[in-house]
C-alpha cells in the first residue's frame, strides 16, 4: 500500500510542475497555428 501512496504523490507533484510550466507561457503552441 505504501507504493500506491508514493506513486500518487509522484504523479501529483509532476502534474503540479507541468501545470506551472504550462501556465507560465501557454500560447507557445497556439501561436504557431
Curated annotation (Swiss-Prot):
Transmembrane segments: 3-23
Pfam families: PsbT
Subcellular location per the Swiss-Prot or TrEMBL entry: Plastid, Chloroplast thylakoid membrane
tRNA processing among keywords: no
InterPro entries cross-referenced by the UniProt entry: PSII_PsbT, PSII_PsbT_sf
Cellular-component GO terms for this entry: chloroplast thylakoid membrane; photosystem II reaction center
Source organism superkingdom: Eukaryota
Swiss-Prot/TrEMBL GO biological process terms: photosynthesis
Protein keywords: Chloroplast, Membrane, Photosynthesis, Photosystem II, Plastid, Thylakoid, Transmembrane, Transmembrane helix
Bilayer topology: Single-pass membrane protein
Oligomeric form and interacting partners: PSII is composed of 1 copy each of membrane proteins PsbA, PsbB, PsbC, PsbD, PsbE, PsbF, PsbH, PsbI, PsbJ, PsbK, PsbL, PsbM, PsbT, PsbY, PsbZ, Psb30/Ycf12, at least 3 peripheral proteins of the oxygen-evolving complex and a large number of cofactors. It forms dimeric complexes.
Cited function: Found at the monomer-monomer interface of the photosystem II (PS II) dimer, plays a role in assembly and dimerization of PSII. PSII is a light-driven water plastoquinone oxidoreductase, using light energy to abstract electrons from H(2)O, generating a proton gradient subsequently used for ATP formation.
Protein family according to the UniProt entry: Belongs to the PsbT family.
Name of the protein in question: Photosystem II reaction center protein T
Provenance organism: Piper cenocladum (Ant piper)
Gene: psbT
